[in-house]
């Protein structure tokens, strides 16, 4: 059975103190750290890149911190070597941003990273079927990518359910609008990796939120037949 993974999104953290934010989330029990890399072309916003990932990695070993790097950039293949050298744990590219899907998967694996493919809300899940079994994770966006703090889109969850039923050992991640109010729907559909930004970083007790998100996934794993 796939494991529940909670990945606080550093996009909602204090960018002037990212090293401390990583440590804070690890202390509160996060499994992964979700790192949003945006180029102001594939999405409107501009965030951080390999240099910042490397700066964070200098403070935490790969055993201490798992950096789940979500690339919202055009031609993500340009960043494989840079992010691998920076210490990224997982390289997640957008299906819509490239035509070199299988090349990216192969090259990123060769560089020692796990590989994921992300789908925008309007992108059908069927497009990844030719290479999905080569992936370590599929990210189903539950908001339009590029901006934090948006509302959860439950209409994206049939893609999660399809993937969980067809590929029971695949990591299925959801990102966008996840909170203690919305996580049950995502977990029940089959998501095991939960990205949450605002809900965690802006909470009075981030530790309780992380625990609650994980408990939701674990409860679904106990009760839903497609997790068996």
From Swiss-Prot:
PROSITE patterns: RIBUL_P_3_EPIMER_1, RIBUL_P_3_EPIMER_2. It holds the Pfam family Ribul_P_3_epim. Gene3D superfamilies: Aldolase class I. Keywords: Carbohydrate metabolism, Cobalt, Iron, Isomerase, Manganese, Metal-binding, Zinc. Pathway: Carbohydrate degradation; pentose phosphate pathway; D-xylulose 5-phosphate from D-ribulose 5-phosphate (non-oxidative stage): step 1/1. Its EC number is 5.1.3.1. The keyword Iron applies. The keyword Zinc applies. The active site is at residues 36, 175. Substrate binds at residues 9, 70, 146-149, 175-177, 197-198. One of its GO terms (molecular function) is metal ion binding. This is Ribulose-phosphate 3-epimerase. It comes from Schizosaccharomyces pombe (strain 972 / ATCC 24843) (Fission yeast).
């Amino acid at each position: 059975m796939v494991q529940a993974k909670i990945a606080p999104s550093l996009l909602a953290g204090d960018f002037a103190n990212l090293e401390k934010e990583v440590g804070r989330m690890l202390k509160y029990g996060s499994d992964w750290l979700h790192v949003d890399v945006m180029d102001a072309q594939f999405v409107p916003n501009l965030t951080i890149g390999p240099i910042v990932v490397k700066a964070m990695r200098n403070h935490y070993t790969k055993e201490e911190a798992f950096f789940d790097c979500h690339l919202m950039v055009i031609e993500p293949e340009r960043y494989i070597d840079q992010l691998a050298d920076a210490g990224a744990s997982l390289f997640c590219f957008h299906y819509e941003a490239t035509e070199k899907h299988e090349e990216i998967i192969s090259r990123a694996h060769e560089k020692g990273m796990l590989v994921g493919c992300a789908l925008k809300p309007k992108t059908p899940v069927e497009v990844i079927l030719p290479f999905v079994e080569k992936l370590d994770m599929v990210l189903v966006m539950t908001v339009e990518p590029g901006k934090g703090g948006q509302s959860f889109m439950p209409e994206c969850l049939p893609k999660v359910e399809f993937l969980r039923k067809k590929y029971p050992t695949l990591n299925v991640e959801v990102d966008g609008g996840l909170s203690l109010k919305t996580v049950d729907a995502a977990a029940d559909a089959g998501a095991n990796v939960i990205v949450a930004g605002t809900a965690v970083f802006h909470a009075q007790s981030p530790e309780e939120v992380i625990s609650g998100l994980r408990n939701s996934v674990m409860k679904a794993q106990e009760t839903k037949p497609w997790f068996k």
